[in-house]
Amino acid sequence: MRVDKIIFIFLISFILIYPFSVKAQVPPSREIQKAQAAEEARQFIREYTARFMKLELDPFMELFSKRAVENRMLPYADIREAYRKTIEGSRSIVYSLDIDSIQTYTQSANVTGRYKIVQGFKKGGKTVFGGDIQWDLIRENGSLKIREVNYGRSW
């Protein structure tokens, strides 16, 4: 009988010390989801910048949806050709970016900012230009892709 009491007391004290968790699984709050989506968009833009500066066309173009449009008029095939020419003629590209805002939605994000590009040419010399930029990102097959990118030039 004494052993039964000891076991009973041990079980009760164990339950009191380590209560069973019966919390319901609650989805993250809307604010947490928005913060996570904004961070995912920031990471995407960092990847965009890094891939562009590596001067490798195929990995860079993987970031674009096949339905992408640039500067409200260039379709994907023309975007690819323009970047191919840019990369072929470049010795180096330094791309810097300041993000002004990120707006997130269920399956997309809109990012605005200012960019600066320093492009060194294979034939010598360099050019510097920059301006406003806006990305419209969509989720395709679980990852973000560029649906639209619009470059402005202010200098």
Regions found by a protein language model. Name each.
Residues 48, 56, 60-61, 68, ...:
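Hydrophobic pocket/interface hotspot
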Residues 25, 29-30, 110, 128-155:
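Short beta-strand edge/turn micro-motifs at domain boundaries
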Residues 1-9:
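Bacterial N-terminal signal peptides that target proteins for export
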Residues 9-18:
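Bacterial N-terminal signal peptides
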Residues 61-98:
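Short solvent-exposed beta->alpha transition segments
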Residues 64, 74-75, 101-106, 113-117, ...:
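A mature extracytoplasmic/lumenal domain signature
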Residues 85-125:
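Surface-exposed, charged secondary-structure patches
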Residues 21-54, 62:
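Short, low-complexity N-terminal intrinsically disordered segments enriched in polar/charged residues
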